[in-house]
């Protein structure tokens, strides 16, 4: 179906008292992203011409968190109901566009469901998203005559007979801009709450002889709202279960789908294996045959084919070439890069450092602001001393260098190709190619020396 241009209104003015938080409710995160950001992303994916965000409490925090989104900010100074919120946005509606109404605390609404709702909207009428519940207590009921939707009655205003209706309003609807503005202008607050209900436009449309078409979401979780942290945690598990299922069906081996969290986007090759309690954040790419051990956190990184990341390793903003091995208990910070076949072992930290092909840093090492060549051995306890208290400096190590244990390289410094650094050395000057650098104090030995003893 050919759709009109469309704008989206997202209601996000609520305080979220039951969250017991200083943070606006819609900024609490699901899968590592603010609830309202999920909704904004869905609106943008639908091709919304404009996204109007109706806000109230915590406006400064919202604007700071969402500063990168192209939003039209609409203030609702007093929270007088959903209809009142839409009235604040109405001056921005074009007559010839469709207006889709969404909620910042309903984060799992899918683009597919919204597109079906958009396609189903009748000319001059309203598309309405509804669901049927075994226990509809507290929700607005859908009233019908001869199968046609005639209105929505809120639970507090419903008769005993109406409260037996199981079909309820989700709050998500779409209509033409000109019609929406006209109906909004007719709303009153003559109800138990003393608020302006957006749901009253359904009856107004019916009275004008307009058609109202109800559409159901694919999953109930799509229209579940969040009012407290318990509800948020439940939706988190729903979301994670869905993501895990998609990955399993796509060929990724998750050892326990219930103990896997995806907080971003995962692109993967074939025969990828992910153990328990792994967290994927941001945009992550895993090549073919990658193995990730338990307890790892991988964020905004590209992991090449045949890499193996051992348990409890943290990788952030990193590029790993093929066949690298990492961990356990390693930390690769932003700017770390490993070339093919490189190895980083336990309790090694890297930042803004490149480790060349076949090079290895086995244990207890810090490599920062460093460029390390191919086939280099970094001994245990090696530290690149890159910071003088004010500025950072670089360490350059050529190919085929052997760095002994407990070595400090005080940057800026360069170690030439094939050089050897003796264990316990503090390198403060450049080392030439194929040279031996040693700076430790000569060993002395005192025969028959006795350790001090405690006085009685």
Swiss-Prot record:
GO cellular component, one term: cytoplasm
EC number: 2.7.7.23, 2.3.1.157
Catalytic activity: alpha-D-glucosamine 1-phosphate + acetyl-CoA = N-acetyl-alpha-D-glucosamine 1-phosphate + CoA + H(+); N-acetyl-alpha-D-glucosamine 1-phosphate + UTP + H(+) = UDP-N-acetyl-alpha-D-glucosamine + diphosphate
Primary localization class, coarse: cytoplasm
Intracellular or extracellular location(s): Cytoplasm
Pyrophosphorylase: annotated span: 1-229
Cofactor binding annotation: Binds 1 Mg(2+) ion per subunit.
Chain intervals for the UniProt region annotation (N-acetyltransferase): 251-456
InterPro entries: Bifunctional_GlmU, GlmU-like, GlmU_C_LbH, Hexapep, Hexapep_transf_CS, MobA-like_NTP_Trfase, Nucleotide-diphossugar_trans, Trimer_LpxA-like_sf
Required cofactor names: Mg(2+)
Quaternary assembly: Homotrimer.
Protein family: In the N-terminal section; belongs to the N-acetylglucosamine-1-phosphate uridyltransferase family. In the C-terminal section; belongs to the transferase hexapeptide repeat family.
Protein name: Bifunctional protein GlmU
Organism annotation: Shigella boydii serotype 4 (strain Sb227)
Gene field: glmU
